[in-house]
Amino acid sequence: MTSAANKRSIMTLFSDKTDIYCHQVRIVLAEKGVAYETEVVDPQVVSEDLMELNPYGTLPTLVDRDLVLFNSRIIMEYLDERFPHPPLMPVYPVARGKSRLLMLRIEQDWYPVLAKAEKGTDAERAVALKQLREEILAIAPIFTQMPYFMSEEFSLVDCYIAPLLWRMQELGVDFSGAGSKAIKAYMARVFERDSFMQSLGVSAPKNLMDEK
């Protein structure tokens, strides 16, 4: 593992463009303004390089000189500590604990439902997207309280929920009715950030706030 990592003089991210966990890490790297190289990996054909670095062959995998990290949460928290500006986690332990719990709940409650929408049958997709839409609309008041998700500043929690909302939009979900204005405002605010656009490599949508 060490010899393979030492061959790389610049930080390298092994990534799949469609993977939501890789997307999280790309947002953080863009927020931090970190120079890095991307090794695009087909998750169905894991390269020998990746297997030498990461015995699980999972994505994302980050190589920073002789350090190899996998698991998006570990990578993102490392990047936040390694490059402290701008900070993406609260300063105080209680607030940090709450942020970690929010990330865990988003990952455990919503990511599996999104996976059903992306990989399931048409019927399973419809059911999964309906569930996601209804559950997010149910917490719409949260989006009115602060500019970002339960925070005055953009944070790692946003790096969890923004890729989810982006994929829902790509799958045709439209938020309408009670609470939708606040959700659309949040989506526009996050999707128009330079870091989010860089994470996609394309322009963010400009029509989210058309319906007011």
Swiss-Prot record:
InterPro entries membership: Glutathione-S-Trfase_C-like, Glutathione-S-Trfase_C_sf, Glutathione_S-Trfase, Glutathione_S-Trfase_N, GST_C, GST_Omega/HSP26, SspA_C, SspA_N
GST N-terminal domain: residues covered: 9-87
Pfam families: GST_C (PF00043), GST_N_2 (PF13409)
Occurrences of domain GST C-terminal (ranges): 92-212
SUPFAM superfamilies to which the protein is assigned, alphabetical: GST C-terminal domain-like (SSF47616), Thioredoxin-like (SSF52833)
One of the record's GO cellular component terms: cytoplasm
Annotated function: Forms an equimolar complex with the RNA polymerase holoenzyme (RNAP) but not with the core enzyme.
Sequence similarity: Belongs to the GST superfamily. HSP26 family.
Protein name as catalogued: Stringent starvation protein A homolog
